[in-house]
Structures are given as structure tokens and as C-alpha cells.
């Protein structure tokens, strides 16, 4: 089970991490335009 962890973790990090970065960047740009 532990040997299968990286095969699940890598795609999750590859999808979740950019999604969080894009969300933070979007919020930063939106608040910057409002302010």
C-alpha cells in the first residue's frame, strides 16, 4: 500500500498545487484591481 502512495500523491500534487496557486493569483489580481 505504501508503494502505491507516490503514484497517487504525485498526480494530486500536480493538480492541486497549481489549482491553489491559480486561485491565490486570481484573488490577488482581483483585490489589486478593486483596491
UniProtKB/Swiss-Prot annotation:
Compartment(s) where it occurs, according to its Swiss-Prot or TrEMBL record: Plastid, Cyanelle thylakoid membrane
Transmembrane segments: 8-28
Listed name of the protein: Photosystem I reaction center subunit VIII
GO terms of biological process kind: photosynthesis
Entry annotated with the keyword Transmembrane: yes
GO annotations of cellular component type: cyanelle thylakoid membrane; photosystem I
Top-level division of the source organism's lineage: Eukaryota
UniProt keywords, alphabetically: Cyanelle, Membrane, Photosynthesis, Photosystem I, Plastid, Thylakoid, Transmembrane, Transmembrane helix
Membrane topology label: Single-pass membrane protein
Family the entry assigns: Belongs to the PsaI family.
Coarse class of the protein's main subcellular location: plastid
Function: May help in the organization of the PsaL subunit.
Alphabetical list of InterPro entries matching this protein: PSI_PsaI, PSI_PsaI_sf
Pfam families given in the database record: PSI_8
Amino acid at each position: 500500500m505504501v508503494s502505491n502512495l507516490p503514484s497517487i500523491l504525485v498526480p494530486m500534487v500536480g493538480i492541486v498545487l497549481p489549482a491553489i496557486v491559480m486561485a491565490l493569483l486570481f484573488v490577488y489580481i482581483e483585490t489589486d484591481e478593486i483596491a
